[in-house]
Regions:
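One-carbon transfer enzymes
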Residues: 1-168
């Protein structure tokens, strides 16, 4: 039996990268999506030159296509998903939608600054999040900038979320 994974996300560059990465792991997971704030578009991203594409390809480095919407990625893979115009990740509509999917794991890639309410953690679902920076040392949304200014390596912390912010 495959592990049931739900991507709870806004259509952000981060969520697009997650979805495109999941394409490489379809044998391990049953993948579904719940996308909210669907009328809010992802930020524009710079294009990659042909020389850069060749470099990444030659060195077997994956670089997501940030111009591909998350819905396009899910449609290409015939993955089930639900969309909501509601931008409130803590709404009953979104909580009920996640419950219907019966996920083993919810990967959260929301819009910047959004914090999940306690209601999400009163379920049997585990929530996984990737935070730029070395938690608990680097908190907030500007961790990459401060890592560079302080001449530290840029890091990402993957953690299971809990009711407490940045404490999972």
């Amino acid at each position: 039996m495959k592990y049931k994974l739900v991507l709870l996300a806004g259509d952000t560059p981060r969520a697009r990268a997650y979805a495109q990465t999941l394409q490489k792991h379809t044998e391990d997971y049953s993948i579904k999506g719940f996308f909210y704030g669907v009328n809010k578009s992802a930020a524009l991203t710079p294009s990659i030159s042909d020389a850069e594409k060749d470099f990444y390809s030659t060195n077997n480095l994956f670089i997501p296509d940030f111009n591909e919407s998350i819905l396009t990625t899910f449609n290409k893979n015939n993955w089930e998903y639900f969309t909501a115009e509601n931008k409130d990740v803590n709404s009953s509509e979104i909580l009920e939608g996640i419950a219907r999917f019966g996920a083993d794991l919810v990967v959260f890639a929301g819009f910047g600054g959004q914090i999940l309410s306690h209601s999400h953690f009163e379920t049997s679902h585990n929530y996984l999040h990737m935070h730029p920076g070395d938690l608990p040392l680097e908190r907030g949304s500007t961790t990459i900038y401060y890592s560079i200014l302080n001449r530290r390596k840029c890091t990402v912390t993957a953690f299971f979320m809990s009711k407490e912010i940045d404490a999972g």
